[in-house]
Amino acid sequence: CAAAYQKEGNKAMHNKGFEKETFKETVRENIKTLYRKTIDEATPQQIFQAVSYAVKDVIIDDWIATQKAYDEADAKTVYYMSMEFLMGRALGNNLINLTAYKEVKEALEEMEIDLNVIEDQEPDAALGNGGLGRLAACFLDSLATLNYPAYGCGIRYRYGMFKQKIKDGYQVEVPDNWLKEGNPFEIRREEYAKEVRFGGNIRFENDPETGKAKFVQENYESVLAIPYDMPIVGYGNHVVNTLRVWDAKAITDFKLDEFDRGNYHKAVEQENLAKLIVDVLYPNDNHYSGKELRLKQQYFFISASLQALLEKYKKKHSDVRKLHEKVIIQMNDTHPTVAVPELMRLLIDQEGLSWEEAWEVTSKTCAYTNHTIMAEALEKWPIDLFSRLLPRIYQIVQEIDRRFLIKVNEMYPGNEHKVKKMAILRDGQVRMANMAIIAGFSVNGVAKLHTDILKTQQLRDFYEMMPEKFNNKTNGITQRRFLAHGNPLLADWITDKIGNGWITDLS
């Protein structure tokens, strides 16, 4: 696929967007078009927007060429599912990976604009919070740099987690309204919107055409998932992958009849309820409503992402039983592990596969990254909440659990300890990590010691039963953002000593 892309890229990417005079003129035109101002009248924030759109114009050509090359090569694609992506600021990182940072800096200096000042106008994308989110962001950067076809899939949080302020020596938490000025690097893709259903009941019937069992969800509530695509630029190779984050919208966002009757709150009630799903990263789950909202968030982005990838796959392939030959679903921690039963649901209820066929596909498609050795941090959901909010998904989880425990009892007859530790459904809870391990073809830790502890202590029973699944992938960070961009003087010194190969290969 990389070779196919390079052939396309060499033809498509003699891009004049970074020729100095052309770039400067584009920035001036963007200021005029966006704000009806001259460059001298524009605020630093407005200049940031204009520069970002000029950079995006260049990225777009690569983006289109990359996706075209992937499509022509029919390349296997990884879908990296994560509750967070701690991306950091996009402008500087994109310029570094386009190998155009110095050129743009010089062009702006000729316009009496300091690129560092402009970069400071960009808020951090509030799509993540900690190491889990930064790992996801670094993986996306590396995948693009190494020419791997990949999508990141997550949620377009409106306020992130929180913005920290210090008042009288104490932390004060306020909403992080990072989208207040808009995000110049994102593209709204309304044409790929997906419906996501919650609650209701499941009715069983026989399909008169096929004679197969059919499960019908009734009396449900649904929201519309709207994708926003952000470019992930590979370093110096003209490859641009995609981070797709989902916004939530009501199916019927405004009820005019309620408004005309004076029921103003009811007129927008459904839209407000939909917005709650994407308002905040990790809402407080110390109460039932918070737990329900978190589970809604997880199913929301997973269901939308899986519907989208299945639709994309079916454009070129008629046999969904071979999905695993073209798709990998990497679950970053336990938050996305509802992907296992959701993929089963789509394959059985929508595509008409048998249980055995669907399980064969799912168990060859899904992989799981574990981030913790603490039992209390391995996500669990109350069965009453899970079954009420996701009734069909719960039925599938029950069947996965039942079939797996038959295998456990066959391998370890009479060993109740094994059953207790390895069951998905136990003590009134749905244990998401157990489900991910049972269904995934790969289970990795993120450091050698961490993985060893998983094998010998925390997940020992699973390791003894299926050792071939376990492996280690030591965490790292991208040297392009944190060294080439973060410390350019040190980066130049290193390059003077050993050349610039370290930018893409630290080995």
Where would I find each of the regions flagged by the language model?
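A conserved ligand/cofactor-binding region detector
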Residues: G9-S507
